[in-house]
């Protein structure tokens, strides 16, 4: 069974970077669509989940990317809504690389502080943290038990 990745990108052109990473990560085929909006998602996802039985869907995945994180979150929600019972595939959401960057930074920090990565009860300051990477990093740190302060260089934060 070939491993397939449906790449849904909210930017007009699908990211070449994301496609290369997908192939290097082991995908046999990557089907990339650019300019994806919520209304496009259902039929694309159904194309993935209806062509393979539930036991074979482990060889299919959906990646949501693009530069606009808010648009990506909407596409992600539409992907989840398109699933039907056991007819679902693994989904990765990483618009603008915000999730992978935050996870890498937090992982590095946790292991720099403690060999076991334990940061419970520690204080963490996320500087310039009001953007997508900083907010995700702050959430991960808080979830791991740190007391988190977020700073910003903007006078107003949405």
Positions of PLM-derived features:
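Solvent-exposed, charged interface segments at domain starts and junctions
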Residues: 39-46, 104-108, 128-133
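Short, surface-exposed connector motifs at secondary-structure boundaries
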Residues: 57-58, 87-88, 142-148
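Short glycine-rich or small-residue beta-strand-to-loop segments that form or flank ligand, phosphate
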Residues: 61-65, 90-94, 125-127, 149
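Gly/Ser/Thr-rich loops at beta-strand to alpha-helix junctions
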Residues: 67-71, 97-101, 129-134, 154-156
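Glycine-rich phosphate/diphosphate-binding loop of Rossmann-like nucleotide-binding domains
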Residues: 111-158
């Amino acid at each position: 069974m070939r491993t397939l990745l449906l790449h849904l990108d909210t930017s007009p052109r699908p990211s070449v970077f994301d496609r290369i990473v997908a192939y290097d990560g082991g995908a046999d085929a990557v089907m990339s669509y650019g300019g994806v909006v919520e209304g496009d998602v259902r039929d694309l996802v159904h194309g993935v989940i209806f062509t393979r039985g539930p036991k074979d869907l482990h060889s299919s995945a959906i990646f949501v990317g693009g530069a606009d994180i808010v648009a990506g979150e909407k596409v992600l929600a539409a992907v989840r809504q398109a699933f039907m019972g056991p007819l679902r595939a693994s989904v990765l959401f990483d618009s603008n690389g915000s999730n992978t960057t935050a996870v890498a930074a937090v992982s590095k920090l946790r292991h720099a502080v403690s060999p076991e990565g334990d940061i419970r009860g520690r204080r963490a300051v996320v500087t310039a943290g009001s953007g997508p990477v900083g907010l995700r990093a702050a959430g991960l740190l808080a979830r791991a038990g740190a007391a988190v302060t977020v700073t910003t260089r903007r006078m107003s934060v949405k």
